[in-house]
A protein has these predicted regions:
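Non-globular, low-confidence helical/coil segments that flank catalytic cores
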Residues: 2-230
């Protein structure tokens, strides 16, 4: 079965707004159609980041697309936003088949569901260290700055609100990926203007409140959602 994607390519070169950092090349973002789930690939220069990997049945489709269509054998950063199956279900398959340099996941000790158990098992087999990122930490993906603007490593009762929220800045353009973070998290975020917003929690009413949307003022929003889901 093929994997449908929606691709966004942002070519800035030196054409950035005044006072914005000068960057070269393009930022490519692949939004994978995994139904009621999330998976996004980001490329800048020769660096790759995969945010989530959909449901269990999506893992092999994502691997096939990465290898066969994009000829990717390694990923610099793999981000599991939180432990729900529709986000990390395919992560174990990705780890089994793609060389991962850095793996970020919120701290969790209960490991109640098989999906997260599988992820920990495969990571251990591959000697892949799991990093529990901290708010304010950042890293570079090529010339794109990636900042952890929220994560809860204290295992909140609502797993959605443990989600890693990632802000990416490329030249003058900003992007926000918020996993399934709900309004309690959104109320704490101070991320400024966002050009392209990956809508939290599949566009459900528990996220993307009117106040939050007003504050980030996105130019575009991307919603990853299953057929006839609302």
């Amino acid at each position: 079965m093929c994997l449908l994607t929606q691709t966004l390519t942002l070519q800035l070169g030196n054409h950035t707004e005044k006072n914005a950092p000068s960057v070269e090349g393009a930022l490519e973002i692949y939004y994978f159609d995994v139904g009621q789930g999330d998976s996004t690939l980001i490329k800048q220069s020769d660096d790759y980041m995969l945010i989530d990997a959909g449901n269990n049945e999506d893992g092999q489709k994502i691997v096939n697309y990465l290898k066969d269509n994009l000829h990717i054998d390694n990923i610099d950063y793999l981000i599991g936003t939180h432990s729900h199956e529709d986000h990390i279900g395919g992560v174990d398959t990705v780890i089994e088949n793609i060389d991962i340099k850095n793996f970020y996941l919120p701290h969790e000790t209960t490991l109640e569901k098989k999906s997260i158990q599988d992820v920990y098992k495969v990571a251990k087999e591959k000697n892949l260290q799991i990093t529990n990122p901290q708010i304010g930490s950042s890293f570079q993906l090529g010339e794109a700055k990636c900042e952890i603007v929220f994560v809860d490593n204290n295992e909140p009762e609502e797993k959605n609100n443990s989600s890693i929220v990632l802000k990416i800045t490329f030249g003058s353009q900003t992007f926000l990926f918020s996993g399934d973070a709900e309004y309690d998290v959104e109320s704490k975020l101070d991320v400024g203007k966002i050009n392209i917003y990956k809508a939290g929690h599949h566009g459900s009413k528990s996220s993307s409140t009117a106040d939050f949307i007003k504050r980030i003022d996105p130019d575009y929003a991307i919603i990853s959602v299953g057929y006839l889901m609302n």
